[in-house]
Amino acid sequence: MELLALRWVLLAGTLLSTSAASSALQEGDLGSITVIMDMALNSFDDQYLLCEDRMRARLQMENITEFSTNIAYAVTWRQAAAEWQKRWGHLARPMQLIREQAIALLAYSASSRMCTLFNEATRQGGRSHQDYIHSYHFKTLHFFLTQALFALRASQPRCYYVYRGVRGIRFMTQRGKSVRFGQFTSTSLRKEATVNFGQDTLFVVKTCYGVPIKQFSFFPSEDEVLIPPFEVFEVINFSNDRGSVKIQLHSKGKMSTHNCELLKPQGGQWGRGHQEVGLGLSPGLSLPVLPCRRRVWEGLGHREGDPIPAAV
């Protein structure tokens, strides 16, 4: 009898230990992967320096083609255009941004589905000239987002301390390393706002080329700051405490390997673009796409009870 009682005690202890271990594993997110940060050299990082007017003229036809091949992009852009019309369509004075720039920011903030497709394409769109011309179907969005960030920064040039939580990826790096996100990256001025977007990695970032887009977002409460793909950061600090990664980055300039790519002759070789920091560039594996911040509302549908922007 005593032996039976002892077995029950041991079994109960085993079950409790298993339950505790299971809970701890859930908190650590078993689905997370480990990724080493790099300079994202496959990224399409065009800054369109000295070719803005020619790009606008060329993109008038490109946008029609892109809409026909990318339904998520087309639907989200139309919804963003409707929201622009509602907010600013009847203003008598010029806006801080031109219409297309404001719509691009609204579209980026509206749908995590389109954002994910866009970021995936942007991180690989710089592999070759042919890939960009024939396979990168976000040329218009990339151009107007880039121009919007430059315009907003010109009106208030300063640096911001921002935060970004990530679910599903534990990024690895080392102090002193130069890195880029290689995509348009959403961050927040409020640390508490990052918790809902994941805790496997926390980025604490000093950005000098990212700008607040609260005025041009479907979700102004997030206090979003959008960082461009060409900004270069130095890793100031890195820690990995029981599976929770914290990375501190400081802006050290900007670097693009491509410029005005759409205007180059077909079959032309890519030349090095605009560079403002001295970096030793070496080809390497491309960093997987940083997940888009989850949006409560999705541009291609919604869940019952979720708020939907009034323009839809």
UniProtKB/Swiss-Prot annotation:
This is NAD(P)(+)--arginine ADP-ribosyltransferase 1. Keywords: Disulfide bond, Glycosyltransferase, NAD, NADP, Nucleotidyltransferase, Secreted, Signal, Transferase, Zymogen. The keyword Zinc does not apply. It catalyses: L-arginyl-[protein] + NAD(+) = N(omega)-(ADP-D-ribosyl)-L-arginyl-[protein] + nicotinamide + H(+). Disulfide bonds join 51-260, 159-208. GO terms for molecular function: NAD+ poly-ADP-ribosyltransferase activity; NAD+-protein-arginine ADP-ribosyltransferase activity; nucleotidyltransferase activity. PANTHER family: ADP-RIBOSYLTRANSFERASE, GPI-LINKED NAD(P)(+)--ARGININE ADP-RIBOSYLTRANSFERASE 1. SUPFAM superfamilies: ADP-ribosylation (SSF56399). Its EC number is 2.4.2.31. Its main location: secreted. Belongs to the Arg-specific ADP-ribosyltransferase family. It comes from Gallus gallus (Chicken). NAD(+) binds at residues 108, 164, 183, 217. It is found in: Secreted, Extracellular space. Gene3D superfamilies: Toxin ADP-ribosyltransferase, Chain A, domain 1. Residues 71-256 form the TR mART core domain.
